[in-house]
């Protein structure tokens, strides 16, 4: 009897895509197909071969190939989209949204053709709007098109709390709701250190500073790098979500999900807590929010909807 190996395709072989592919292979979660445009096929093949040649040293058994041919992605269990352009000097936000939306639609058509049963994870920014664009183009059930930002934003939140308290990140739990931007909503009230509410451990003004740093977390990395944006933490976040799906772990994680009345919103993708498993989003978890938390989430939703107006 032949056992079918899991297969994950990563679209976009830049820093984030390549790092995601390598981490997936290192963890032996699946065989990996790294995809980029035809003009970058040789560099993509080179990166994949370089990763594969690390397998004897790292001790992992996973096949990795680079390609520009979507036929090589056929029958993927999960497809991760990291492709897209970054905002360039002189480019408006609307231009970025319109351009990346066109890229998403083209990629999605190829995914749907070759892997009609796949679960799609979207990272490309602005991620809430891009996930919506992929969903509309794919025609997949909503639970199989998911955006990634909450795991990353929550990881940043947990990191800063860990540093503040000088405690292991393993003991820090938290949630960040809303869109992936300055209006995201880190939920202090649902965040703990070893089961102890943060509000009993960290002064209010320090918590507010941590929340603000979390909101600006991506920009902080961009400013320090000088060129480009974060990729290690985004890649690790994608891998955590992919693992939850491939292993049907039913993890409670923040993810960008399609809402149909949850939290009082409909027809948009927004970061909320979900149960993530073998079918994708198994359930959206609705938290009880205080008035100020709901107001903050409303502002975040307004920002997401403003971006979505530009979708083509």
From Swiss-Prot:
Entry's Gene Ontology BP terms: lactate metabolic process; tricarboxylic acid cycle
Taxonomic source organism: Bacillus mycoides (strain KBAB4) (Bacillus weihenstephanensis)
HAMAP family in the record: Malate_dehydrog_3
UniProtKB keywords: NAD, Oxidoreductase, Phosphoprotein, Tricarboxylic acid cycle
Modified residues (Phosphoserine): 149
Name the UniProt record assigns to this protein: Malate dehydrogenase
Lineage: Bacteria, Bacillati, Bacillota, Bacilli, Bacillales
Keyword Transferase: no
Classification via Pfam families: Ldh_1_C, Ldh_1_N
Active site per database record: 180 (proton acceptor)
């Amino acid at each position: 009897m032949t056992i079918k190996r899991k297969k994950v395709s990563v679209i976009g072989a830049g820093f984030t895509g390549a790092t995601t592919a390598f981490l997936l292979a290192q963890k032996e979660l699946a065989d990996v197909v790294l995809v980029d445009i035809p003009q970058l096929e040789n560099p993509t093949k080179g990166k994949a071969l370089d990763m594969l040649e690390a397998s004897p040293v790292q001790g992992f058994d996973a096949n990795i190939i680079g390609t520009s041919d979507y036929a090589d992605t056929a029958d993927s269990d999960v497809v991760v989209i990291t492709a897209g352009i970054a905002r360039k000097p002189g480019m408006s936000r609307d231009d970025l949204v319109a351009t990346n939306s066109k890229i998403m639609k083209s990629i999605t058509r190829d995914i749907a053709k070759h892997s009609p049963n796949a679960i799609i994870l979207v990272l490309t920014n602005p991620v809430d709007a891009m996930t919506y664009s992929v969903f509309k183009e794919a025609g997949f059930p909503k639970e199989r098109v998911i955006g990634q930002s909450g795991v990353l934003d929550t990881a940043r939140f947990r990191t800063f709390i860990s540093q503040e308290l000088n405690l292991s990140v393993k003991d820090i739990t938290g949630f960040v709701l809303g869109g992936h931007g300055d209006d995201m909503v880190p939920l202090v009230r649902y965040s703990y250190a070893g089961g102890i509410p943060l509000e009993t451990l960290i002064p209010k003004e320090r918590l507010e500073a941590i929340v603000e740093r979390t909101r600006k977390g991506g920009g902080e990395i961009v400013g320090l790098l000088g060129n480009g944006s974060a990729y290690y933490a985004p890649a690790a976040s994608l891998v955590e979500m992919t693992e939850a799906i491939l292993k049907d772990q039913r993890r409670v994680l923040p993810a960008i999900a399609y809402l149909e009345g949850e939290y009082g919103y409909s027809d948009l993708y927004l970061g909320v807590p979900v149960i993530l498993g073998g079918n994708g989003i198994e359930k959206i978890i609705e938290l009880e929010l205080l008035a100020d938390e709901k107001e903050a989430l409303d502002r975040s939703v307004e920002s997401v909807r403003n971006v979505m107006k530009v979708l083509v």
